[in-house]
Amino acid sequence: MASLLGTSSSAIWASPSLSSPSSKPSSSPICFRPGKLFGSKLNAGIQIRPKKNRSRYHVSVMNVATEINSTEQVVGKFDSKKSARPVYPFAAIVGQDEMKLCLLLNVIDPKIGGVMIMGDRGTGKSTTVRSLVDLLPEINVVAGDPYNSDPIDPEFMGVEVRERVEKGEQVPVIATKINMVDLPLGATEDRVCGTIDIEKALTEGVKAFEPGLLAKANRGILYVDEVNLLDDHLVDVLLDSAASGWNTVEREGISISHPARFILIGSGNPEEGELRPQLLDRFGMHAQVGTVRDADLRVKIVEERARFDSNPKDFRDTYKTEQDKLQDQISTARANLSSVQIDRELKVKISRVCSELNVDGLRGDIVTNRAAKALAALKGKDRVTPDDVATVIPNCLRHRLRKDPLESIDSGVLVSEKFAEIFS
């Protein structure tokens, strides 16, 4: 892999310049009233009716309207958050090639299922993940929709937008960059899932729903730093949403659902606690990060960081060409991904590796196939080779192996040894 990535990203990747990060959805609540449309953001008529033989209520969306003065206003809102906090350039990250490759492959193919990054303190895990925001491509979303609904694909539409499309209504569309949402350790369940005002719903027939972080992360990236320290009840919420692609908020018999399909990226220090196996298996790939030992590289990292801290704008301008090239290569890889082929013989060998390593389930097989195709697309090829599989398979399987407390060999080494045995 070192030969592929090197110590600088400039040797391999690069991209169409998309400098404007996406904006936050409106922080104001979304108000719903039975049989009536109102409000200035997103409005929905809600019918509240008692279920048979039950004293509670069920809330169903009946109709929706979106009022926007002009598309220019929405675009302005998306552009208003230009570089509020300077981000360290991805191309300037020294070393950590395994982590960078896993992140890029997930941007190329979000269906890989995310990355879990584990490593020592101060090794650049959070810096690298957040630097990815400059490289994220643009997507089309329905203007004014808090769930970043896709205007074409029903699988990525909120309920309200889908009903409007089914009625033949033309929905306003804008282009914005893929969103990266940080999930803080201290977040409450209501902040993550969204909030329903139960009192208004039951007494006045008015339901105010404010979308949470999962709504904002739909069709984007959800980043959890120190994910191994996350509260168990929030881990359960992430598991449910990652498995189903939908987030359902239930409060006193009142229910509302919205799409929540996101790339889950987590980072943490294994010394601070292990991750629950149920959550670990949800990550498509696993990257291990170690401290740089080479003295020259350490000096270079310190000097580069000092330059960035003293003048972030000039430092980012220094790497603009490399960033643009990397963006261009990512966009090309995303466009060509569907045409990349993988031979059946390689698929069979991948499944043999998974079977002989006693990997539970089929996620390992699926993710390895997807990651190998994404790597081939990144290299500009239309067919997967054994070298592509060899590069990604340790990251796809190491966290799925059953733990042996007496085993001192790294799981990635075991995967590589089994790969060499079967592919030789």
Curated annotation (Swiss-Prot):
Biological processes, Gene Ontology terms: chlorophyll biosynthetic process; photosynthesis
Record text on activity regulation: Redox regulation; active in reducing conditions, inactive in oxidizing conditions. Thioredoxins f and m mediate the reversible reductive activation of oxidized CHLI1.
Disulfide pattern: 102-193, 354-396
Transit peptide: 1-60
Any one Gene Ontology molecular-function term assigned to this protein's record: ATP binding
Subcellular location: Plastid, Chloroplast
Phenotype of gene-disrupted mutants: Homozygous mutants are chlorotic lethal when grown on soil, but can grow on sucrose-containing medium. Dwarf seedlings that exhibit reduced leaf temperature, wide stomatal aperture, and a pale green phenotype.
GO cellular component, one term: chloroplast stroma
SUPFAM superfamilies named among the record's database cross-references: P-loop containing nucleoside triphosphate hydrolases
Modified residues (N-acetylvaline): 61
Subunit architecture: The magnesium chelatase complex is a heterotrimer consisting of subunits CHLI, CHLD and CHLH. Interacts with CHLH and CHLD.
NCBIfam families: BchI-ChlI
Free-text function comment from the UniProt entry: Involved in chlorophyll biosynthesis. Catalyzes the insertion of magnesium ion into protoporphyrin IX to yield Mg-protoporphyrin IX. The magnesium-chelatase is a complex of three subunits, CHLI, CHLD and CHLH. The reaction takes place in two steps, with an ATP-dependent activation followed by an ATP-dependent chelation step. Possesses high affinity for ATP and may play a major role in chlorophyll biosynthesis. Does not bind abscisic acid (ABA), but is a positive regulator of ABA signaling.
Family to which this protein belongs: Belongs to the Mg-chelatase subunits D/I family.
Name the record gives this protein: Magnesium-chelatase subunit ChlI-1, chloroplastic
Organism: Arabidopsis thaliana
Gene designation: CHLI1
